[in-house]
Every structure is written in C-alpha cells, then in structure tokens.
Swiss-Prot record:
Keywords: Flavoprotein, FMN, Luminescence, Monooxygenase, Oxidoreductase, Photoprotein. The gene is luxA. InterPro entries: Alkanal_monooxygenase, Bact_Lucif_Oxidored, Bacterial_luciferase_CS, Luciferase-like_dom, Luciferase-like_sf, Luciferase_bac/NFP. SUPFAM superfamilies: Bacterial luciferase-like. The lineage of its organism: Bacteria, Pseudomonadati, Pseudomonadota, Gammaproteobacteria, Enterobacterales. CDD domains: Alkanal_monooxygenase (cd01096). One of its GO terms (biological process) is bioluminescence. GO terms for molecular function: alkanal monooxygenase (FMN-linked) activity. Signal peptide: none annotated. Pfam families: Bac_luciferase. This is Alkanal monooxygenase alpha chain. The synthesis of this protein is regulated by a complex control mechanism that has been termed autoinduction. It comes from Photorhabdus luminescens (Xenorhabdus luminescens). Gene3D superfamilies: Luciferase-like domain (3.20.20.30). GO terms for cellular component: cytosol.
Length: 360
C-alpha cells in the first residue's frame, strides 16, 4: 500500500493568502512524518479555488524541505506552457531531488487560463497529447524538436538531462473515456477522481485495462491512484460537520472558476464534463449541501472504521493500492494534522491490497 496527500491550497474566506502558503509548507513537511509517500500539488490560476499558479516552484521547496517524500503535480495544465520549458523544469526537479518528483498532467478545465496564456481551449486535447509526446521523447532522448500543426522549432538539447531512467514518472488526471483510453495507450497511471463512485471507478479501470493490454502493457504494474476527500475522527458526526463549511465554499469556488458548465458555453471537447454536471443537477447535487452529503457516501469521512470500509471497497473493486487523500477540509492546521495522524494510526495499517489472483 502507498499513501499520498493532496495539498489543495484553497483559500477559505477566513484565511489570508499568507496563511494558506504557511499551511501548504507545514502540511508538506508533516506528511513525511505521518507516513505519506507523496504529496500532490494542484495548478490553478486566478481563483481562490487554488492559489498555486506554479506547482514546480512549490515542489522544489517541499523537495528541499524533506528527505524521502515524493512530490508530484496533480496536475500541470499541459497545453498552457511551452513543452521545452516544462521539460526543463521537470528534469531539473528530477535531478535535484534524485528522482523524488512525480509529473502529473492534465489538459485543463478553466477557460480563463487558456485565454490569458494565449492557448485555444478548443484544441486542449490535441495540444496536451502533442506536448506529452514531445516531453516524453525529450526525457529519453535528451533533445526536442517539433514540426507539426501545433508547434514548430528546431532540434535543441534540453538541460539538464533526466535523472530517472526514462524520465520522471508521469501520471494523468483522467475522468473521461477519451482521456482514459489515451492514458492506456501509453501505459500511463491515472489519478482517478474523488467524485465518482465505486462502480464508476471499476468501469474506468476495466476500460483502461482493455486498451492497455491491446497496446502490450502489463496492467498489473501500473501505479494508478485513488483520490479522496478525507476526514477521520472517532466521532463520525464531528468528522462530517467540520468539513461541511469548507467543502461548501470549495465546491462553489470550483463551479464559479470556469464557464464550462454553463449551457451557453460552446467550447469543444468537454462534452463529458458538461454531461457529468447535468447528471449532478438532475440528482439535485447543484444544491451544495446535497452535493456534500453525496460526497460523504463515497469518500472516507467519518470514523476510522467508516474510512476503512469506503477505501477498502474501492481497493477490492479496482485493485488499486495507491491511496491519495486530501485533508484540508478538516478546519485549522492543527485539526488537519490531527486527522492525518489518526488516518496514519487507525486507517493505514488496516487497508489491504487486493490479491493478485483476484485482480482482474
């Protein structure tokens, strides 16, 4: 079993940005003490939903502040920055940390990012796939060049070279069938969403495995991650109530940060996300409290045993043994750390990998 910690850098109304940054640093350091293998940093711009515009810089700080902890991005919005600059950052972190950096990528969901950085959101999928191909080739070859409809530049040597054999490990934040199939073609591990239930996670893995096997990948050695909103307390009601205010603001901030869910939005390539939002509305989840209540049904929020039951159900359904949690809904920094430590002592030791013979 492996365990990760998502550091959201969301700014609740009662916190200053300086307080959010202090929380990020402290939780990153404490994560290593609490037995987490990896912390994951999210890229967001122009919204209190996440204050981390450059996860590479934050990753460098946390890698320098820890000894064994892996630090990953979940995820870099791949199409909005030049692929050569990105590989330079990735390789530098890979070298300086001696292989402790994890390169999580996505194609992006927030309209303003694309407008400000001068990228056409309608082409986000094609750009992300193109950028990944260039970056991955650069990781292994040490050089990059491009001559296609999206980008053109002459062959250049990328410094420094990667430290890890084959480059820093790459992960994909995957929600739609299209992204799942694309990740499977390359055998890239997915970070699965915390907003889908066990049956949906199982179906996503089945689709991935079918495609990955067609491309010759060993599906038993791909390090997928299950992601969760997490709050652990011996009092189940307290665990849920302490999260409610934070999650209410956080969910609303998420919806308000993009226009992709508006019926009037005509951006191409986001039919899955729009359809998922329509399903939420039909289920009554547009109401914030109802959405939170549903989140509690599929995320480890409650007593240690309740958390074990929810996570173990997903492990048994998917075979995934890399569990990534986000604890920041737990209130103050001290309350967040208390929840992390209780998770370490009363949840981590009792989660079991699915037996290989029963995996698929």
């Amino acid at each position: 079993m492996k365990f990760g910690n998502f550091l959201l850098t969301y700014q609740p109304p009662q916190f200053s940005q300086t307080e959010v940054m202090k929380r990020l640093v402290k939780l990153g350091r404490i994560s290593e003490e609490c037995g987490f293998d990896t912390v994951w940093l999210l890229e967001h711009h122009f919204t209190e939903f996440g204050l981390l515009g450059n996860p590479y810089v934050a990753a460098a700080y946390l890698l320098g502040a820890t000894k064994k902890l892996n630090v990953g991005t979940a995820a870099i919005v791949l199409p909005t920055a030049h692929p050569v600059r990105q590989l330079e950052d990735v390789n530098l972190l890979d070298q300086m940390s001696k292989g402790r950096f994890r390169f999580g990528i996505c194609r992006g969901l927030y309209n303003k990012d694309f407008r400000v950085f001068g990228t056409d959101m309608n082409n986000s999928r094609a750009l992300a796939e193109c950028w990944y191909g260039l970056i991955k080739n650069g990781m292994t070859e040490g050089y990059m060049e491009a001559d296609n409809e999206h980008i053109k530049f002459h062959k250049v040597k990328v410094n420094p070279a990667a430290y890890s054999r084959g480059g820093a490990p790459v992960y994909v934040v995957a929600e739609s069938a299209s992204t799942t199939e694309w990740a499977a073609q390359f055998g890239l591990p997915m970070i699965l969403s915390w907003i889908i239930n066990t049956n949906e996670k199982k179906a996503q893995l089945e689709l991935y495995n079918e495609v990955a096997q067609e491309y010759g990948h060993d599906i038993h050695n791909i390090d997928h991650c299950l992601s969760y909103i997490t709050s652990v307390d011996h009092d189940s009601i307290k665990a849920k109530e302490i999260c409610r205010k934070f999650l209410g603001h956080w969910y609303d901030s998420y919806v308000n940060a993009t226009t992709i869910f508006d019926d009037s939005d005509q951006t191409r390539g986001y039919d899955f996300n729009k359809g998922q939002w329509r399903d939420f509305v039909l289920k009554g989840h547009k109401d914030t409290n109802r959405r939170i209540d549903y989140s509690y049904e599929i995320n480890p929020v409650g007593t240690p045993q309740e958390c074990i039951d929810i996570i173990q159900k997903d492990i048994d359904a998917t075979g995934i043994s890399n569990i990534c949690c986000g604890f920041e809904a737990n209130g103050t920094v001290d309350e967040i750390i208390a929840s992390m430590k209780l998770f370490q002592s009363d949840v981590m030791p009792f989660l079991k990998e699915k037996q290989r013979s029963l995996l698929y």
